[in-house]
Structure formats: C-alpha cells, structure tokens
Swiss-Prot record:
<dbReference type="GO" id="GO:0005186">
    <property type="term" value="F:pheromone activity"/>
</dbReference>
<dbReference type="GO" id="GO:0005576">
    <property type="term" value="C:extracellular region"/>
</dbReference>
<keyword id="KW-0588">Pheromone</keyword>
<keyword id="KW-0964">Secreted</keyword>
<protein>
    <recommendedName>
        <fullName>Pheromone peptide ILME</fullName>
    </recommendedName>
</protein>
<comment type="function">
    <text>Has myotropic activity targeting the genital tract.</text>
</comment>
Length: 4
C-alpha cells in the first residue's frame, strides 16, 4: 500500500 502506497499513500501520500
């Protein structure tokens, strides 16, 4: 999971 990649979040910004």
């Amino acid at each position: 999971i990649l979040m910004e």
